[in-house]
Amino acid sequence: MRITIFDTTLRDGSQSRNISFSVRDKIEIAKALDDFGVDYIELGWPGSNENDMQTFLEASKLRLKNAKMVAFGSTRRKGIKAEEDSNLNAILESKAKVACIFGKTWLHHVEMQLKVTPKENLEAIEDSIRFLKGKGFDVFYDLEHFFDGFKHDKKYALECLRVAANAGASCLVLCDTNGGCLPDEVRKIVSEVNEFMKKNKIKTELGIHMHNDSGFATANTFEAVKLGVAQLQLTVNGFVERSGNADLCLLIPALILI
């Protein structure tokens, strides 16, 4: 199994308290990350602000040796087609070749935040991935709050995963967005995901995105690797909002040693 390193310092890490990257900051950090050898650099969310869009346009002029630039976004809004969604169209305009979009997995958020039916959420996941794939993008799908969603309604969380895979996502990223998981929970849930994928003949690569509110983000990521998860979403020094993410600077040396 080849492990791929997906650095989200410039997107998720930029949400840290007292951190505000300029366009030039992001470009220089991206060049350093490329020199370091990471596979993917999530440069920002082009649909959220002009600064991030400008960063993508500047980054498109770089000749990177190792990394691919990734544009972040979300599934389409309710009541509109994917091609009408400004957030998805911003990804197209970013000049990136890889998109990482997130969508709801926890039914509580589907019903209370999005205010849509479970079926409508599944349709938004499918529509958004198919739209970007149709435009030539490699699409990673972040299953936001996957672990909480799984604990609340396993069947629905796995259905979100299945729909994303069938729509053409090349990586299904299991997210502990609240950061509350413990290593034994990660071991159990990822094992069940593997069984579900085997049973349903889903061969899509798995990724992991862990927050550190419980203090176990790096350990949880390590557990996921042992269960065959290939894409690791990390930040330099674990920088991100609240308590941080899995730490690239700790995890890579640990992986080298195993």
Where do the model's predicted regions map?
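Catalytic cores and adjacent flexible loops of soluble metabolic enzymes
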Residues: 1-258
